[in-house]
Swiss-Prot record:
This is UPF0210 protein CA_C0479. PANTHER family: UPF0210 PROTEIN MJ1665 (PTHR37560:SF1), UPF0210 PROTEIN SPR0218 (PTHR37560). InterPro entries: UPF0210. Belongs to the UPF0210 family. Gene3D superfamilies: 3.20.70.20. It comes from Clostridium acetobutylicum (strain ATCC 824 / DSM 792 / JCM 1419 / IAM 19013 / LMG 5710 / NBRC 13948 / NRRL B-527 / VKM B-1787 / 2291 / W). Homodimer. It comes from the Bacteria.
Length: 451
């Protein structure tokens, strides 16, 4: 490396807020099944604390040795519905508490995998887990839950979509004293992926190895700073600039992943190329979109700008990493992005425009607060719309929505830390009840039949 490259990397970290958002250790719990729930939970606790005992220490060592901030150390596990259904337990709240205790024992920030994959239907374990979600999230601190309700191969399980609307409302009501904040630990997916290092949707897929290290990068501020140097240039130049910047960002992630894998003696899984914003000024995906040329995020042209950004990040990042996976693109979580928050407050960005943006970006409607009296059927309708985008376009989509109990449009929910502030956004006043109450399954699209 020449001196300019070294100085450029230092500048990315110190001035442009480049960081490694997460080192996530995925752990298989498939050998923790037992007909006795207590025995199963003991095996789960012992395995997590054994495999992850050095995760935080190693993350801090790498941060110190290389000077790259590593914001979170996390764990993902096999979906608990698959593990717990071997037992005769009638609810799985104790499994969530076990995950919580194990994660706290090793010092990680979050643990994901209180999850169920119900895109075609529910097993006994899936049904019990879904019923357990509200109490599980209410009685734990750092456990995250996810449910996959659709896939491009199987269509959309509308029975599960209906149920998730009610579950989200139940979670919100149990945390009414904090305006429904516990909902930020729950995400509903279509086309969920098995190697996601980001929360709340991370789980360790059944096709994964015994234990792996997945790394999620960040760096919206670096991309914006690069684009400031090409003001007024054609889109070709914009795309090339983003690609080159994404390459540099991803190289840092590859270095951290390789070192973590070596020090922990755990196989390297993937680098997730996602641009993950924070509420801090200068670390916003919305501000990148505005730098590309729209006056405010949400104005006409926003979706096209986001599509360009997402594609260029993938093209640049994929050349810098040996294995790419996860969600890999640009995140647009409203409460976690200073520019998104400003756009919503100014009226430039609404729920419908956000839905359009999810057609071309990494995930979906993320960290969105809606009025606390929003009907469960309306929430289910929002989930169904987002799932349809994912299923038809063969991409991952998701909904992480917070019914802000006791709040209305114009109020704001304060989450604090990386979770930021969510302005309460208006939703349609027209009912989706008759649509949601049909139940059944929406069939998979014609182009899903590829065999």
């Amino acid at each position: 490396m020449n001196t300019n490259e070294i100085m450029s990397t230092i500048k990315m970290i110190e001035e442009q807020k480049l960081d490694i958002r997460t080192i996530t250790m995925g752990i298989s719990l498939r050998d923790c099944c037992s007909f006795n729930g207590e025995e199963s939970r003991k095996r789960i606790y012992d395995k997590i604390t054994r495999y992850a005992q050095d995760l935080v220490r190693v993350g801090e060592e790498i941060e110190r040795d290389y000077g790259i901030p590593i914001i979170n150390k996390r764990i993902s596990v096999t979906p608990i519905s698959m593990i717990a259904e071997s037992s005769d337990d009638k609810d799985y709240v104790e499994y969530a508490k076990t995950l919580d205790r194990a994660a706290k024992a090793v010092g990680v920030n979050l643990i994901g995998g209180f999850s169920a994959l119900v895109h075609k239907g529910c097993t006994k374990g899936d049904k019990i887990l879904l019923q357990s979600i509200p109490e599980a999230l209410h009685t734990t601190d750092i456990v995250c839950s996810s449910v996959n309700v659709g896939s491009s191969k199987t269509g959309i399980n509308m029975n599960a979509v209906k149920q998730m609307g009610h579950i989200i409302k139940d979670v919100a009501n149990l945390s009414a004293s904090t305006n429904g904040m516990e909902c930020m630990k729950l995400v509903v997916f279509a086309n969920a992926i098995e190697d996601n290092p980001f929360m709340a949707g991370a789980f360790h897929g059944v096709g994964e190895a015994e234990c792996v290290i997945n790394v999620g990068i960040s760096g919206p501020g670096v991309v914006k700073a690069s684009l400031e140097k090409v003001k007024g240039e054609p889109f070709d130049v914009v795309a090339e600039t983003i690609k080159k910047t994404a390459f540099r960002i991803t190289r840092a992630g590859q270095l951290v992943a390789r070192e973590a894998s070596k020090k922990l003696d755990v196989p390297f899984g993937i680098i997730d190329l996602s641009l993950a914003p924070t509420p801090a000024v200068g670390d916003s995906v919305a501000r990148i979109i505005e730098e590309i040329g729209v006056e405010a995020c949400g104005a006409p042209g926003t979706t096209a700008a986001l599509a360009l950004l997402n594609d260029a990040v993938k093209k640049g990042g994929i050349m810098a990493a040996s294995h790419v996976g996860g969600l890999s693109g640009a995140f647009i979580p409203v409460s976690e992005d200073e520019g998104m928050i400003a756009a919503v407050k100014s009226g430039a960005l609404n729920l419908e425009k956000l839905e359009a943006m999810t057609c071309v970006c990494s995930v979906g409607l993320d960290m969105i607060a809606v009025p606390g009296d929003t009907p469960a059927e309306t929430i289910s309708g929002i989930i169904a719309d987002e799932a349809a985008i994912g299923v038809i376009n063969n991409k991952t989509t998701a909904v992480r929505i917070i019914p802000a109990i006791g709040m209305g449009v114009g109020d704001s929910v304060e989450f604090g830390g990386l979770f930021g502030t969510a302005p309460v956004m208006p939703v349609s006043k027209f009912s989706s009840a008759d649509f949601i109450n049909r139940g059944g399954r929406i069939p998979s699209p014609i182009h899903s039949f590829k065999n």
